[in-house]
């Protein structure tokens, strides 16, 4: 099998514009892709780690990741009329449950990671007077994401995305 460098645009990030909030509601979701006007999507995994040193380690620690918060920083230009951007921009002054929805990421192999999410740090416009409006927000996963293999035949127990 030949090795391939995937390009970032091959990843697909979507949000539910119907505002469903649990994985039980996936079949009710109205998915909108974050693509038009979007320049960068940067995934992040903020980890909680235990680094307890034990005597048998002679004072040195081992690292155990005990928790994780997954998020996606999304930036680009505001495109009025785009379903995903319009939905997110409409939540700019929202708080609490109004910022919750469903999201899914499909990697280049077709594997899907779906999760309840919170829309954070929404910037619906901004920039110089003679420039396209900026658009950015953070999409934060709530709880452990559900991973579906590329065949779509079922949920895997692996929470990683190693292609």
Q: Positions of the model-derived regions?
A:
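Solvent-exposed edge beta-strands and adjacent loop segments
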Residues: 2-78, 116-133
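Short beta-strand and beta-hairpin "edge-sheet" elements
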Residues: 104-148
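Short, acidic/charged, Gly/Pro-enriched secondary-structure junctions
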Residues: 83-116
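Short, surface-exposed linear patches
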Residues: 64, 94-99, 124-127, 140-143, ...
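A generic "cationic amphipathic patch" detector
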Residues: 87, 132, 151-152
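Acidic glycine-/aspartate-rich tracts in secreted/extracellular proteins
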Residues: 79-81, 144
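Viral virion structural and adsorption modules
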Residues: 1-4, 138-140, 144-163
């Amino acid at each position: 099998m030949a090795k391939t460098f995937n390009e970032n645009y091959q990843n697909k990030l979507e949000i539910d514009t119907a505002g469903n909030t649990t994985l039980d509601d996936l079949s009710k979701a109205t998915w909108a892709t974050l693509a038009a006007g979007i320049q960068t999507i940067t995934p992040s995994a903020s980890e909680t780690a235990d680094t307890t040193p034990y005597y048998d380690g002679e004072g040195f620690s081992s690292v155990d990741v005990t928790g994780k918060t997954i998020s996606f920083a999304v930036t680009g230009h505001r495109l009025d009329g785009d379903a995903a951007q319009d939905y997110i921009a409409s939540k700019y002054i929202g708080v609490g449950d109004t910022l919750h929805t469903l999201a899914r990421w499909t990697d280049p192999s077709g594997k899907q990671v779906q999760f309840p999410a919170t829309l954070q740090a929404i910037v619906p416009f901004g920039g110089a007077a003679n420039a396209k409006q900026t658009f950015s927000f953070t999409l934060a996963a709530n709880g452990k994401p559900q991973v579906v293999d590329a065949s779509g035949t079922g949920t895997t127990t692996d929470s990683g995305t190693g292609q």
